[in-house]
Structure formats: structure tokens, C-alpha cells
From Swiss-Prot:
This is Beta-mannosyltransferase 3. GO terms for biological process: beta-1,2-oligomannoside biosynthetic process; beta-1,2-oligomannoside metabolic process; cell wall organization; protein O-linked mannosylation. One of its GO terms (molecular function) is mannosyltransferase activity. Belongs to the BMT family. It is a single-pass type II membrane protein. Keywords: Cell wall biogenesis/degradation, Glycosyltransferase, Membrane, Signal-anchor, Transferase, Transmembrane, Transmembrane helix.
């Protein structure tokens, strides 16, 4: 009935104030009789009630104005107007094609070229901005050195020979990547979580230990130092002091958090105050499941030390649980578990998860269709941003990724894919509506091995980490190259693209006879249909056979 707390408390004030005034006039206090004692008691209760409503109204008004003001200040023309690295934001066109069903019948033998969606729309991306600073790794190494006296597991970050100099250690053994960010409009800042990895042997893909670090940026992506949030003692930038399971093995390797993904979590606390906080999902090895890789959630501003392992009801832990893509639906924390589309709903207090949509967990349906995996968080598209005839469903937009082997001259290729999922507002069943071809945001990733060409290196890694900001036709995306960078691009025209695609497929969204599980499997499979064509073209246009750095 009420769309916001402000509307609710406004209505209460309008209702209660006149009633209270009438009561005070009808039953005035005259003397100290028994009747007047009752009137006095009731008037005190009414006064307290009105004061509480007024307090809640003012608090809701402050939050609402803070939200509106922050959003307005953030989006004058572009989501990013200036940064330390870049002044004017220049955009260049990007070609995106994908796959969706319109009137095709989903069959196991369906050809991917029959469900291509290839509209020539004005999608554009900015140049990439580097969010890592040269001094970041030294800062976080120094911070860990300070914290060693409080937590001896941090000693594992300092297993270097006495003759090694710090500059060489940082260059060969330390990495900062997987930067996932979210906009906290109540505070007018971006919260960003990073993975800080240390490898005793200098092998990036087999680190000794990893820990999460937090940074805060203003609306223009300028880092804020000494930043604190209400209800939290952490001061940013900082190492996030979450629990790290060190296992039972004598050799300590690949410990700690990997692949962090952050989303906005909002709730009302026991004092009636609306809270905004970052909620982080990550995977890590855990002794609770016999040293298997498990998913966890972490709320650094709520409890900076506690992590909660996620478990699926009636489903034994797999050897590796990873790549769950988080999103919020109402007050629920959900995850895209895998493709064909399975959705989990998880309790943030105890980590218990239930499958709420998608095929059952069994050997056959559990096989992943194609190469598609979870990538970023998913963000809900506001209903008011869509035409009225599309508002019977809720939609979420995100960026998945694929891992492809033997693609042209490259042995291993990781690339993003735009995805769109939805559900009818009267149902809990989610559907995968669209998946794009491989995209790269016009970025030519750094080679895995410095000094080599992409072809001679044989590995090209571009991982989307977060949809950090989304508003109208703009979005900001963070990504990493070669497991060693944190970068940001802005895109515009994305909402127009999605709206046109939904217009194209709207009749299919109403078709209750369709098979969403099979369609999801086919869309996932088709996502890499043109991979070989992409790699051949990229070799020529991006110079994969030439040294670029």
C-alpha cells in the first residue's frame, strides 16, 4: 500500500494529529480527580506516540532527501564526470549482439543462428580507468604488517627471504584485483572490495593466501581516506579483518577469500533506522566441509570478523562452490547458482539456502550448458524505467562470463556476456530471457605474461567484477585483466537496448506453454556460438599477434 517509509509516516501524522488535538480538547485536565488521572495518562501516551511518529517521519524524510540529493548530484550528464586519471569522458560505439526467443520453438536441435538478436542500436562505452594506484599494494602490505600482532595468520603474507627488497616482493608476489563496487546513495560514496593476494612462490594462479580489502570512493571515483560509516569502527581504506580458515594441512596454500562480489543490502534496524550496507559474497576453502571450496557471505560494517558459509538444503557440498551471482529481490538475498538457470534464496543470518527456481539437482540437469558462468552482481531494472506493458514482470540485469579453450590463437579465453533474467510478479519462477555474445567493452586485456603477445602467451583474461552503478541509460562496470588489475568503464545506451529487446520478445514473455529450462540451456549454449569468429576478428583488430605493451 505504501511505497516508502516516508509515505507511511506521513499518513500516520495526517491521521493521528487531528485525532490527538480533538482528544486533548474534549478531555482537558482539570484538577486531580480519578477521571483526570486517566485522561492525563492517555494524553501522555498519545503525546509519546506522536513524538515517535514525528521522529520516524523526520528520519525517513532525511534518508529520502539524502537519496534524492545524492542521485541528483551523481548524475548530471554522465555517471562519471571527472576522475584523478581522466578528465573528460569520451565514448566510442560498441557492437553487441545476442540471443533471445521470440516465436521460435525451443528444441534440443535448435540452431543458434535462429534466435539471434542483432539490432543496430547506439551502445557506447568509455575508455577504461585504472582504479589501482601504484602505492596501493605497499599500503595494504604495511597494514597487514601492523595487524600481525592481532592475528598471526597474517604472518603467511611475509614469507620472504631476508635479502629480498620490498619493491621486488611487491612486484613479483603481491596482487590486487577482483575489485567489486556498489553505490551507497545514503552516503554518496562507492564502496569497493578488492582481493589482495600473496604468493610465496610468485605464482599468480596459485597464491599462498588472500584477504579482502575495502576502499571508498566519491561520486567521481576519487578515493576517500579516513572514511568511516555509522555503526562501524572500520576506517577506510583498510584490510577487512574477516575470519580466514587456515585448514589442517602443514603446507598453507590458496587460503582465504576469492572472487568477492558486493551488493547493496538495505534493512531497518531495531531503532527504526534505515541501514545501507555492503554485503559481500566470496568463495574460500573451509574445514566445515572437509576443505572443499564453499561460498560465504560477509557484512563488514555489521560484523567485521564474522563470515557465514552458505549451504544448500538437501544438497551435499560439491568439491567447488563458486561463481554464484548475487542479487536482491524484495527483502531476499538470491543467487544465480548456474546455467541452465537455477536460483537460490539464502538466509543472511545463518547461510541456509533453498533452490526456489530451476531444474532439480541431479546428474543430468546439473551439467552446465555451454561455457557460461556467474560474473557480476545483478541489478534490478526499475519498473518505471520500462514501458507500462512490460511491467507485469521484474527484471534483473547482470554480466556473466565464459571460459573458452582453443579459441583462435588463444588457448584460454575469458570474456563477459550481458544477461537478463526475469520473473512474473505473481510467481517465484525465474527465466533467462537474453544472453549476449562475447563482449570486451573495446578493451584489449593485458597478456597474462608480460612481454608476450596475446597469441604467444595463449591466455586472455577479462573478468567482469561488478555492475557498480546503474541509472537511466548509464551504467558503470568494474573488471580485471589477467588477475592483476582493477579498472572501470562507463556504458550508455544499455537501457534502450534492453527495452528494445524486450519489445522484440514481449509475446514470448506471455507464453505460458514455453519451456524456460530448455530455453535457458539453449541460450547458455549459444552464448559462445560465435567465439571462433570473435577470436579471429580480435586477432586482427586488436593486434593479438603484436606486442602492445
Amino acid at each position: 500500500m505504501f511505497e516508502s517509509d516516508l509515505s507511511f509516516y506521513s499518513a500516520l501524522l495526517i491521521l493521528c494529529c487531528p485525532i490527538s488535538i480533538v482528544f486533548f480538547k474534549k478531555f482537558p485536565i482539570k484538577g486531580y480527580t480519578g477521571a483526570n488521572k486517566v485522561s492525563l495518562f492517555l494524553q501522555c501516551l498519545i503525546a509519546i506516540l506522536n513524538l515517535n511518529i514525528l521522529y520516524s517521519f523526520i528520519n525517513s524524510l532525511t534518508i529520502t532527501l539524502g537519496h534524492d540529493g545524492s542521485s541528483a548530484n551523481t548524475l548530471t550528464i554522465d555517471p562519471i564526470t571527472t576522475t584523478q586519471q581522466q578528465g573528460h569522458v569520451d565514448y566510442t560505439p560498441i557492437k553487441v549482439s545476442g540471443y533471445t526467443f521470440k516465436n521460435q520453438v525451443a528444441t534440443k536441435n535448435l540452431q543458434c543462428d535462429s534466435i539471434v538478436y542483432d539490432q543496430d542500436l547506439d551502445l557506447q562505452v568509455s575508455q577504461a580507468v585504472d582504479l589501482n594506484k601504484p602505492e596501493d599494494l605497499k599500503f595494504f602490505r604495511d597494514k597487514l604488517n601492523e595487524l600481525r600482532s592481532l592475528n598471526n595468520i597474517y604472518d603467511l603474507f611475509f614469507q620472504d627471504n631476508e635479502d629480498e627488497v620490498e619493491e621486488s616482493i611487491l612486484e613479483r608476489k603481491w596482487y590486487k584485483f577482483c575489485g567489486s563496487a556498489v553505490w551507497l546513495d545514503k552516503y554518496g560514496v562507492y564502496f569497493m572490495v578488492n582481493r589482495i593476494a600473496y604468493s610465496k612462490k610468485g605464482t599468480r594462479n596459485n597464491p599462498t593466501i588472500s584477504v579482502l580489502a575495502g576502499q571508498v570512493f566519491d561520486k567521481n571515483w576519487i578515493e576517500l581516506t579516513g572514511k568511516k560509516f555509522p555503526f562501524s569502527g572500520l576506517e577506510f581504506p583498510t584490510i577487512l579483518p574477516h575470519y580466514i580458515d587456515e585448514g589442517k594441512e602443514a603446507e598453507k596454500v590458496i587460503l582465504g577469500a576469492e572472487d568477492p562480489r558486493v551488493i547493496l543490502h538495505e534493512y531497518t534496524n531495531e531503532n527504526g533506522i534505515r541501514i545501507q550496507e555492503p554485503l559481500i559474497a566470496f568463495n574460500a576453502l573451509s574445514t566445515e566441509v572437509d576443505w572443499k571450496r564453499a561460498m560465504h557471505i560477509y557484512r563488514p560494517l555489521h560484523d567485521p570478523h564474522r563470515i557465514i558459509r552458505l549451504s544448500i538444503e538437501n544438497y551435499a557440498p560439491r568439491e567447488k562452490e563458486k561463481n554464484w551471482a548475487p542479487f536482491i529481490d524484495g527483502n531476499n538475498l538470491n543467487f544465480v547458482y548456474n546455467f541452465p538457470l537455477r536460483i537460490l534464496r539464502c538466509n543472511i543470518n545463518n547461510g541456509d539456502c533453498q533452490k526456489v527456481s530451476g531444474p532439480d539437482f541431479n546428474d543430468k540437469s546439473h551439467e552446465n550448458a555451454g561455457k557460461l558462468r556467474g560474473g557480476t552482481n545483478l541489478v534490478e531494472i526499475p519498473s518505471q524505467s520500462l514501458p507500462k506493458h512490460l511491467r507485469s514482470r521484474k527484471y534483473w540485469f547482470g554480466i556473466a562470463r565464459s571460459h573458452i579453450t582453443d579459441c583462435g590463437c588463444v588457448g584460454e579465453l575469458y570474456r563477459p556476456h550481458l544477461i537478463l533474467i526475469s520473473r512474473n510478479k505473481k510467481s517465484d519462477q525465474y527465466e533467462l530471457n537474453y544472453v549476449s555474445d562475447l563482449i570486451d567493452f573495446n578493451v584489449n586485456p593485458e597478456p597474462w605474461t608480460p612481454g608476450k603477445t596475446t597469441c604467444s602467451d595463449g591466455k586472455s583474461v577479462l573478468i567482469p567484477n561488478s555492475v557498480a552503478f546503474i541509472k537511466d541509460d548509464y551504467m558503470s562496470v568494474t573488471f580485471s585483466e589477467a588477475d592483476k588489475t582493477n579498472k572501470l568503464i562507463n556504458a550508455k545506451g544499455w537501457l534502450t537496448y534492453i527495452t528494445k529487446m524486450l519489445e522484440f520478445t514481449q509475446e514470448r514473455l506471455k507464453d505460458e506453454s514455453s519451456d524456460p529450462v530448455l530455453e535457458s540451456r539453449l541460450l547458455s549454449k549459444c552464448s559462445t556460438f560465435l567465439a571462433q569468429q570473435y577470436c579471429a576478428l580480435s586477432k586482427d583488430t586488436m593486434g593479438w599477434d603484436k606486442l602492445s605493451r
